[in-house]
Amino acid sequence: MVLTDPIADYLTRIRNANMVRHESLVVPASKMKKDISEILKREGFIRDYEVIDDDKQGVIRIFLKYGKNNERVISGLKRISKPGLRSYVKSDAVPKVLNGLGIAIISTSEGVITDKEARAKNVGGEVLAYVW
């Protein structure tokens, strides 16, 4: 199956698994998805992830995180830059998500980083997604 937007598929799988409160989910692996998973883990949106290597592409198993009383940690995920309409920002226009409560995931020349890191490094790039 050919996907035109693998990042949107990745975010949708996380959103769907989160809505029905699954413990984990599996997505096809890529370097970009590994980088985004690392950011989500570091920022506390997911519990953990592991890369399972098979003879082909490999998969990433993501372990979702829930709070007390099984409440969701991820309230929302939104794809910003799409294949048909790319969204780039300069270093002085890096967006804040919900006044700092969420994160923007940005692909820069420094790699895939959060909006806070982009402001600290004074770099812009392609805004991939918002997570809150």
Swiss-Prot record:
Phylogenetic lineage: Bacteria, Bacillati, Bacillota, Bacilli, Lactobacillales
PROSITE patterns attached to this UniProt entry: RIBOSOMAL_S8
InterPro entries, alphabetized: Ribosomal_uS8, Ribosomal_uS8_CS, Ribosomal_uS8_sf
Annotated Pfam families: Ribosomal_S8
GO molecular function terms listed in the Swiss-Prot or TrEMBL record: rRNA binding; structural constituent of ribosome
HAMAP family: Ribosomal_uS8_B
Family, similarity comment: Belongs to the universal ribosomal protein uS8 family.
Its job: One of the primary rRNA binding proteins, it binds directly to 16S rRNA central domain where it helps coordinate assembly of the platform of the 30S subunit.
UniProt gene name: rpsH
Key words, A-Z: Ribonucleoprotein, Ribosomal protein, RNA-binding, rRNA-binding
Protein name: Small ribosomal subunit protein uS8
Species name: Lacticaseibacillus paracasei (strain ATCC 334 / BCRC 17002 / CCUG 31169 / CIP 107868 / KCTC 3260 / NRRL B-441) (Lactobacillus paracasei)
One Gene Ontology term from the biological process aspect of the record: translation
GO cellular component: ribonucleoprotein complex; ribosome
Top-level taxon: Bacteria
Subunit composition and interactions: Part of the 30S ribosomal subunit. Contacts proteins S5 and S12.
